[in-house]
Amino acid sequence: MVEIILPDGSSRSYDQETLTCGQIAASIGKGLAKAAIAGVVNGQKVDLDAPVPHGAQVAIITEDSPEGLEIIRHSASHLMAQAVKTLFPQAQVTIGPAIENGFYYDFDYERPFTPDDLTAIENCMRKLAKRNEKVERRVMPRDEAVAYFQAMGELYKAEIIGAIPAGEDVSLYSQGEFTDLCRGPHVPSTGKLKAFKVMKAGGAYWRGDSRNKMLQRIYGTAWATEADLKAYLTQMEEAEKRDHRRIGKDLDLFSVQEDAGGGLVFWHPRGSRIRRVIEDFWKDRHVEAGYEFLYTPHIANRQLWNTSGHTDFYSDSMFSPMEVDEQAYQIRPMNCPFHILIYKDRRHSYRELPFRWGELGTVYRYEMSGALHGLFRVRGFTQDDAHIFCTEQQIEEEIQRILDLTLDILRTYGFSDFEINLSTRPEKSVGSAAIWDKATEALRRAIVSRDLSYVVDEGGGAFYGPKIDVKITDSIGRKWQCSTVQLDFNLPERFDMGYIGEDGESHRPIMIHRALMGSLERFFGILVEHYAGWFPMWLAPVQAVVCSITDAQHAYAETVLAALKKAGLRVEIDLRNEKVGYKIREHTLKRVPYLLVVGDKEREEGTVNVRLRSGKSLGSLPIQDVVERLVEEAASRALSASEDQEEA
C-alpha cells in the first residue's frame, strides 16, 4: 500500500508495492496521463517512471506548464545532439541546456555547420522523434562514468564528470544509441517531442572562456504544440523586422563603432534627441516624486570595491584595475557605493529620512564579445539608478511610491501589460529572519495595495534582500525585464551606515536599490522594437519636416521652420530640388509623424498643408494652428495622433 498527497491536500492510496508518477497521472485521468511528462516528489523534479515513496507529496508536470516546457526543451537538446552524432559521428558533444524559448547544444566539430547541415539535423530529429524511443535514466559511479565517456571518445563529457567530487554517482540518460550526462528529468520518450525547429548556428568558446577552443553552437526552439511553435516563429519573424540594430541604422539613431571597441554605444544626433526626451521626462517625474539628483565619479580606488564586496563577488564583470599615484583604481560597475559615501559624509537623524537620491549614472561591465548584442547587451550603459535610505517603518510606503512611479513611467511609454515577481529569502543570506520576514511582507503589501497580481519566486531573492521585478510586454508579445526594486541589508552593514533614532541610539538604515527602465540603452532598444521605429510624436527624433514644392517657397518654408522651432519642436526642412511626392515618401519611410508641405497657395495664405505619416491629409491649416496642434500633442505625450492610428 502506497499513500500519496496531492497539491490540493487530498490523499490517494494505491494497493501496490511500487508506484510511479506516470501511474498516478493515469489513475487521475486520461487527459492528465497524456499531458504528463514528469513529476515532482517531495519538492524534487523526477522522471515519470521514478518510484514514489509512501507518504510523499506529489505533483504532475504537464507539457504546457513552464516547468514542462523547460523539460521539453532540455529533452529536445538531447534529441538534437543525438541527430548530430548520427549525421556527424566525429563531432564531440559538450553541453546543451534549455534556455528561454528554446535550447542550444555546443559541439566540437572540424568546421562550422552550414544551413544545409541544420536542415538535415532537423529532419533527422523528426525521424528520431517518430521512433518514440524510450528515454532511460541510469546511475553510475563517477570514475566509471569518466571511463565510459573516454572510451566513446567524448572527452568533454569526461572532463565535466572528472570535476565532480570523487566517490559521487552521476546520472546518465539514454535514448536509442545516444547517451548523455544529465541530472534530468526528461520526457519519457522521444515521441513526446513534436513541435521543434532548429534555428541557427554560431560559435561559442568552451566554458565561455576565449582562451579555450571555439565550439559550434546550434540553437533550437521547442514547444508543447505545433500551434505554439507556429505562433513563436511568427513572433520571431516580426521581431526580425523590428530589429533595433537595423532600424537604428536606417533612422541614424546610434551605432557601435568597432574602432572604439565592442559593446560601446555612440548616440547620433537623432538618437540623442530621443535620449534627451527620455532623460528629461525621467527627471521631471522624479522631482515630482521627491527625489534629489546626484553626480558621482566613474572610477574609484580599488579599496572602495573591496569594502562593497564587488572585488570578491563581482570581479569577473569588472574591467581590470589601472594604476593612479601608485594606487589601483577601477571603473565602476555600479553606482551604489558612491551614493553610500555621500550618505556617510555627515551624520543623520531619523527626522531626515527617507533620502531619495537618483542618478543617471553610466557604468561599465565586462561582457564576452560573443554575448554583445546591439543595445541589449553592452559594456557601457547608463542606469536610471536611485537609492532610498529609510527606516524599517518606512519600507512599505517607499515601495508603494516606487511602484506608482514605475508603472506611471512605463505606461507613459505605451506599456500596460505587467508581470510582477516577488523574490524571497534564499538559503544563504545576510540579515536576521525577522527583518527578512518584515521586509518581504512590506513588499507584498505594497504590491497588493496597488491591486497588482504577482508571482512569488520562493528563495529567488539576492543574498542581501528580497526584491520585486517588473516585466513589460511589448507590442508583439515578448516579455522584457526592466524594473527592479531591491532591498539591501548587506551594504549598510559593510559600510557601517547609521542614523540616530528617536531613542537617541544609532540604527542601520534600510537601503533600497531601484532602476525603473534598467538601462537607457536597453530600454531605448526595447522602445525601437516596440514601435518598430514609428515612435509616438512626443518621442520622435524628427517630429515634422517642412517640404517646399519649388524654389519659390524656400523663404516661406524657412519662416514655418522658425515658428515651429521657436515653439520647441524638433523640426527639419527639405528644400531639395526633388518632386514633393518623392520627399513625402522618403520622410514617411523615416517615420516622421508630420509632413508639412508648402507651395504657392500656402505661401500666399499663410498656411501649411499637413499630412500624417499614415497617409491621411489634414488639409491646409494656418501656421499658428499647426504650431499649437503639435505642441499640444507633444506635451500630452499621446501615443498616437487622433487621426493617425497606424500601428507599429
From Swiss-Prot:
Domain TGS: 1-62
Localisation per UniProt entry: Cytoplasm
Catalytic activity annotation: tRNA(Thr) + L-threonine + ATP = L-threonyl-tRNA(Thr) + AMP + diphosphate + H(+)
Residues reported to bind Zn(2+): 336, 387, 513
GO-annotated biological processes: threonyl-tRNA aminoacylation
InterPro entries: aa-tRNA-synt_IIb, aa-tRNA-synth_II, aa-tRNA-synth_II/BPL/LPL, Anticodon-bd, Anticodon-bd_dom_sf, Beta-grasp_dom_sf, TGS, TGS-like
A GO cellular component entry from the record: cytoplasm
Function: Catalyzes the attachment of threonine to tRNA(Thr) in a two-step reaction: L-threonine is first activated by ATP to form Thr-AMP and then transferred to the acceptor end of tRNA(Thr). Also edits incorrectly charged L-seryl-tRNA(Thr).
Name listed for the protein in its UniProt record: Threonine--tRNA ligase
Encoding gene per record: thrS
